Amino acid sequence: MAPKIFIDGEHGTTGLQIRTRMAGRRDVELLSIPEAERRNAAMREDMLNSADIAMLCLPDDASKEAVQMVSANNNVRVIDTSTAFRVNPGWAYGFAEMDKEQAEKIASARFVSNPGCYPTGAIGLIRPLRAAGILPDGYPVTVNAVSGYSGGGKQMIAQMENPDHPDAITAPHFLYGLPLTHKHVPEMTVHGLLDRAPIFSPSVGKFAQGMIVQVPLHLDDLAEGTTMESIHAALVAHYAGQEIVTVVPLSDSKALARVNAVELEGKDTMKLFVFGTPGGSQVNLVALLDNLGKAPRGVQNMDLMLAS
């Protein structure tokens, strides 16, 4: 019998992406609530408790409510795409390439929290340097990023694409999270192995999908003897054997005149770059990915859990 999968929130941006990716699969059975019944709490609870894996594509509070509905049913495993459980020690963090052991932790977990799009890029750059002893305690990390507007969900998509929307956004690029209290900062801190919260400055561009995350560093403030080449080597070693996360060779990065935010639109992969001048005192670490990566991450984590 095929495992039963219920996507709670299948009509939202992330839920639709996951459902599209799973269309046509015969190895799983997709449970579904008709859109007209999606606010039927009794039907929703029944679907959640009938599933082998419940994939939650909901706002934080609704995800917490869904988890309560299945908390007593050990037959149901959960993948959550909200921010509600990403730093909860009782949940496996769903970034399988983050460490060598992470895929196994996901595979054996009952509860898995999908990583956010910005944190995936930031953690992907920062964690290997912390693990290698290159990035010292107390370093004032800065993370700058630009995302496609689809990351803002249906409301922002309408604001960006419909000029007649009452709150239409016409700017080609804008900053937000101006008080520096973005909800992804705790996630970056915990899973980036940082002892000090980074300054995070997110922004949105007038393109639907894609993302660039930047972490600039002063070499003189890192571990003694750190160079652009040693940082690159640490990233290469950390992701050796991985197919989803790739580290671009320094020679290829040097040949680039620009980085295109939409290059990986619709793809599951992430590219990491190290930019700078050989012998210089600064480097800029860059992660390139699709901002809607929660969808492929969710399916990847589901496959890991089903294979266990």
UniProtKB/Swiss-Prot annotation:
HAMAP family: ArgC_type2. Its EC number is 1.2.1.38. It comes from the Bacteria. GO terms for cellular component: cytoplasm. Signal peptide: none annotated. InterPro entries: AGPR_AS (IPR023013), AGPR_type-2 (IPR010136), NAD(P)-bd_dom_sf (IPR036291), NAGSA_dehydrogenase (IPR050085), Semialdehyde_DH_NAD-bd (IPR000534). Pathway: Amino-acid biosynthesis; L-arginine biosynthesis; N(2)-acetyl-L-ornithine from L-glutamate: step 3/4. It catalyses: N-acetyl-L-glutamate 5-semialdehyde + phosphate + NADP(+) = N-acetyl-L-glutamyl 5-phosphate + NADPH + H(+). One of its GO terms (biological process) is L-arginine biosynthetic process. The keyword NADP applies. It is an enzyme of class 1 (oxidoreductase). Its main location: cytoplasm. The keyword NADP applies. Keywords: Amino-acid biosynthesis, Arginine biosynthesis, Cytoplasm, NADP, Oxidoreductase. This is N-acetyl-gamma-glutamyl-phosphate reductase. Catalyzes the NADPH-dependent reduction of N-acetyl-5-glutamyl phosphate to yield N-acetyl-L-glutamate 5-semialdehyde. Transmembrane segments: none annotated.
